[in-house]
């Protein structure tokens, strides 16, 4: 009995040699197909069953019941394992739902078909039809009556015992990662469930899903460095969007009182375990909501997504518990310094102390920074990474919140929040600034910063100011990082683990 075909990929084997051998087999298949009038890559096989359903429906039946019922099944998938034993062979077929074992004998399929099967390779895609039975070890299997090669695989799969050890290779050849690793497939299924559940949740709460431009004449909606391109027909510079915010708020001006969009944003910045230049965000806006309403709703969204994707809102990330079930904590920037940075109330209000604390963390605060900016700077340096359980941080300074409404009680801070979990930002929202003159002044300040060399500062968006002049109702808006949420829900340490095809340096 052989369990590994002569041309299966094993450590130390030359892949080029294996590919050459498989190409020879394909050439023979083409010649045979031409001689018989058949297709080398046929597309007329229609599977009627899936592995997971066959197991679910028939796993509990005894061998005797299966023999008496003679249940037919027709399945297609990729051959992952193969055992050749003279006039009989076993193979494991993997389809989109799972795996099932095939039993192929000369008596059932004929000597010619069995001989052909023995030359097929791991990774080939097969179609098989037969009846279900159980082996002597009790494994549900398909006793094959007919079997066909549907797609010849030219590249060998990684060795089943070693898999894809190179993590970057998994990102670069995601299709192979998905073939070999059930955990990877489950991770992306969970992502799909979560995104679908969020979309359904938004619609059920009266939000209209919309699509706004990906190419912007002016980048806006966030402080970030954009990707730049050129529109040939219009002969003008364009930017891949860094955020959809300004377009979505223009829709609220137009009368769509609740809107949301789940789509890609692009930021020409660094790559890390938490950052990918192309990433998925959901932004939503609701007329007559405040930042308090947004926080309540954001909690509900995350809780709902967790339950739908993984069955619970009590999670574990990196071996530590994360509780999305309980109410999320809420702290001002100032109070977070008292709770997590060891400052007293007096110290948190003392600019000299704050500057000294920042220097102790290796940060030199600019001379013009206000009290609120110093508090925020120290928050980023000393507090952010300590916020493991879900925590909303509120009362951000105006200087770092150019689109947020200022607080009526203290105009130096805004009605803005950010949500932190596991020491990372997951969401950002605020009561929207709907005073067109105030917004124009803030855009002007941002434009001055850009002229002074700040590449991430915002442009002055005349179209948006004109829209505001028609009147934006009191509105709340929030953005949630879908990729980081998926990292949390699937306990993934790297953002590239939850993006099917992450950004990588070009090979060669």
From Swiss-Prot:
Protein's gene: lysS
Entries under SUPFAM superfamilies matching the protein: Class II aaRS and biotin synthetases, Nucleic acid-binding proteins
InterPro entries the record matches: Aa-tRNA-synt_II, aa-tRNA-synth_II, aa-tRNA-synth_II/BPL/LPL, Lys-tRNA-ligase_II, Lys-tRNA-ligase_II_N, Lys-tRNA-synth_II_C, NA-bd_OB-fold, NA-bd_OB_tRNA
GO CC annotation: cytosol
Subunit structure: Homodimer.
Localisation per UniProt entry: Cytoplasm
Family: Belongs to the class-II aminoacyl-tRNA synthetase family.
Cofactor note: Binds 3 Mg(2+) ions per subunit.
Binding site for Mg(2+) 2: 425
Name of the molecule in the record: Lysine--tRNA ligase
Enzyme class: ligase
Signal peptide: none
